[in-house]
């Protein structure tokens, strides 16, 4: 027996996919979300749950975990018409008798339209590249931070020079016993305001240095030797916790097999977010067009447009003029 055919299937359960699902529910659509990870929320939930986000409209500051919780709470209003499938990777899809058949790593799904909101795809941390690094990865060497409190009273060394590295250093300043930030360049790549805060903090910065060796025992790293760039100078740092903040590599490997026009790891879209195949739309970092700004807020603005276009595609003879949410929710 064939599974139920949904109006819209959203590939990706990150912030943009969740808001698209909410808006589709608001418009009365049945929706299925297919997410490759074991939880909803995407990178903010999985990689940066305690990192503070400052560029979400109407929220001066909130963490990745808080953003995810609010989006899921918003979505729960339409639990009766929204299905969620976790730990499923979309392998391919094809159009059969006017509807889409979506093949995942676990099952087949059926949908009248598709919105791709999978961001830049699967992600994995960039490592130090040291031989014995993975010996400590399950204990006190971290590539992302799930709880700031686990570093309370500890000597923390952070490697990296971007926004995440600087943000973690500032967040741990005063909570950890000491914070040392190691970067391979003299200049940090973080936002100017954050760099100014760093200069006025108690964080020790060591630049330009690169990691050279790790020492430890019983799976716990307790020393890291760093070397100054273009120099023989070496420093050995004693530590309790090591955070590697070199960012994450991403891959949308299956995207190339979807028979859609793409550029690098994103799908080329029209001004109305339709891909090269009618009935399939892309939003968020999964969409590529000139002038796009890679912000969550950008994707939030794209979602209603894509949903409305999907509804027009599914029900071309219906009066599809969108109305304000105040008229739809009591």
Swiss-Prot record:
It catalyses: 2 reduced [2Fe-2S]-[ferredoxin] + NADP(+) + H(+) = 2 oxidized [2Fe-2S]-[ferredoxin] + NADPH. SUPFAM superfamilies: FAD/NAD(P)-binding domain (SSF51905). Binds 1 FAD per subunit. FAD binds at residues 35, 43, 48, 90, 123, 285, 326. The keyword NADP applies. GO terms for molecular function: ferredoxin-NADP+ reductase activity; flavin adenine dinucleotide binding; NADP binding. Keywords: FAD, Flavoprotein, NADP, Oxidoreductase. InterPro entries: FAD/NAD-bd_sf, FAD/NAD-binding_dom, Fd--NADP_Rdtase_type_2, Ferredoxin-NADP_redctase_2. Its EC number is 1.18.1.2. Its cofactor is FAD. Homodimer. Belongs to the ferredoxin--NADP reductase type 2 family. This is Ferredoxin--NADP reductase. It comes from Streptococcus equi subsp. zooepidemicus (strain MGCS10565). The lineage of its organism: Bacteria, Bacillati, Bacillota, Bacilli, Lactobacillales.
């Amino acid at each position: 027996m064939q599974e139920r055919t949904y109006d819209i299937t959203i590939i990706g359960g990150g912030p943009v996919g969740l808001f698209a699902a909410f808006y589709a529910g608001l418009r009365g659509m049945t929706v299925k979300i297919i997410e490759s990870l074991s939880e909803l929320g995407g990178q903010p939930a999985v990689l940066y749950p305690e990192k503070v986000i400052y560029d979400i409209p109407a929220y001066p500051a909130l963490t990745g975990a808080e953003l995810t919780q609010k989006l899921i709470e918003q979505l729960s209003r339409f639990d009766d018409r929204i299905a969620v499938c976790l730990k499923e990777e979309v392998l391919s899809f094809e159009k059969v008798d006017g509807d889409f058949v979506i093949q995942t790593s676990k099952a087949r799904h059926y949908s009248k339209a598709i919105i791709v909101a999978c961001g830049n795809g699967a992600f994995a941390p960039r490592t130090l590249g040291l031989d014995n690094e993975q010996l400590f990865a399950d204990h006190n060497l971290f590539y992302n931070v799930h709880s700031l409190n686990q570093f309370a009273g500890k000597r923390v060394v952070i490697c990296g020079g971007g926004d995440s590295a600087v943000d973690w250093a500032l967040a741990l300043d005063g909570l950890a016993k000491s914070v040392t930030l190691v970067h391979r360049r003299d200049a940090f790549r973080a936002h100017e305001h954050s760099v100014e805060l760093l200069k006025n903090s108690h964080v020790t910065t060591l630049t330009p240095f690169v990691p050279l060796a790790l020492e430890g025992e019983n799976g716990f790293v307790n020393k890291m030797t760093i070397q100054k760039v273009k120099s023989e100078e070496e420093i050995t740092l004693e530590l309790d916790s090591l955070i590697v903040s070199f960012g994450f590599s991403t891959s949308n490997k299956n995207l190339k097999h979807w028979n859609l026009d793409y550029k690098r790891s994103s799908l080329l879209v029209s001004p109305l977010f339709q891909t090269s195949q009618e009935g399939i739309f892309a939003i968020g970092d999964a969409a590529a067009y000139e002038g796009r700004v890679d912000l969550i807020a950008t994707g939030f603005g794209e979602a209603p447009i894509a949903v409305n276009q999907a509804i027009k595609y599914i029900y071309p003879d219906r009066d599809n003029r969108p109305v304000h949410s105040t008229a739809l929710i009591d």
